[in-house]
Amino acid sequence: PVLGAANPRTGNNINDDGRPVILVIGDSLSAEYGLQRGQGWVQLLANRLQKSGSNYTVVNASISGDTTSGGRTRLPALLKQHRPSIVIIELGGNDGLRGLPVARMQDNLAAMVRASQAMGARVVVAGIRMPANYGREYTERFYAAFANVAKQHDAALVPFLLEGFSDSPDFFQADRIHPSAQAQARILQTVWPVLEPMILAKAPAKARS
């Protein structure tokens, strides 16, 4: 199985109105697969920023079914178009579900971090775990890859995107792969403590005035 099938949606970008951009490049875990529009954690993040008066805008460039190879291919054009201040990379789940080499996934993630940083963006890497039936050796190497990339390239890390509910069927859709609507706030709670310091550390001048 692969993680989903929904279309990416984009928001305002810094080239249009001068607002700093948070770019989320991910798969169905960020693309509202199986959810009503507006229920996903990325939209909840945008809502939180808006309610707090933050000057940031969120661009969701997530595509269900995407892999790190797909993200690596798509990212340069997204960076050029949106000039993000922060990039959240939420990819790798489909690499794992397909049993693709961990070394290749790690190389793709590292390339995406470097490309984002080269454009002046700060980066958050969101990790994911594979089910135990993929074998201990593979699942451990897979999970470690996200931390390795973050450490080697001085990126922030969300160790496990589905922290706190991955073993709770009530928080998943019928396929037991994709988080349900009620899980989306939990995902944001996991991402927010890592993301918030980035937002506060370099508040845009427009927000401070």
Regions found by a protein language model. Give the residues of each.
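Serine-esterase "nucleophile elbow" of acetyl-processing enzymes
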Residues: L3-S64, R74-R83
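Structured catalytic cores of enzymes that bind and process phosphorylated ligands/cofactors
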Residues: P1-P8, V123, S180
